[in-house]
């Protein structure tokens, strides 16, 4: 038998013999942005609090989305809402770890997505699971103008254990997808006009001041409640494509349409991305 040991070809790569913790390996490309995979994509995250309101909120929003389809190709992502809060409460009482709570909440977001997709089914819109969004979104959006998915990132049992409540929820997941695809934009649709200095529906609503524009850095310093995930502010700091996110009131007809057309109708949150 011929000894072929010495004929094995070595892979010529600076990564082959180095630790991936060596920052010198990525320094030559550190200042370059990754390519935009889907630069025409608009990502719209529908908050669970909007879905919780039922037909009064959902039907006008569905009609607005239907009218937007000729203008944009959309990835519509849904949050979980009050049902996730209930499952968190039960799970915490039972002592479930954060990694067990995360997929439970994600399933509630998926239910909202199925509802929204059913309402838009006549337009060729369907619900797709995480693997399809990750690997086949382009082909789906070449066949139809929009798809619906869960906004929760699939951390599930890999969720960070530092908190009892899963920190990476719907807003964070929507942003991670939008930035990974190099989307044209991300609009977060909630039940408030945007970001306030205090909860506009809480006991301190009299002191709540509306913020038409702010930054992830400034919001991270605030201690009050926010209508978006705190973890969203962390991932914004290391974003590669999405320069700003707009939070708008989905209960006001026309706000989402205006936002997707580039109008300032809510709160603009600047990320850590520098303009190209």
Curated annotation (Swiss-Prot):
It is found in: Cytoplasm. Optimum pH is 6.5 to 7.0. Above pH 7.1 molybdenum is released. InterPro entries: AceGlu_kinase-like_sf (IPR036393), Asp/Glu/Uridylate_kinase (IPR001048), MoSto_subunit_alpha/beta (IPR030669). Pfam families: AA_kinase. Gene3D superfamilies: Acetylglutamate kinase-like (3.40.1160.10). Induction: Requires molybdenum. Signal peptide: none annotated. Keywords: Cytoplasm, Metal-binding, Molybdenum, Storage protein. GO terms for molecular function: molybdenum ion binding; nutrient reservoir activity. One of its GO terms (cellular component) is cytoplasm. The keyword Nucleus does not apply. Intracellular storage of molybdenum. Binds polyoxomolybdates. Can bind at least 90 molybdenum atoms per protein molecule. Belongs to the UMP kinase family. Highly divergent. Octamer consisting of 4 alpha and 4 beta chains. This is Molybdenum storage protein subunit alpha. The gene is mosA.
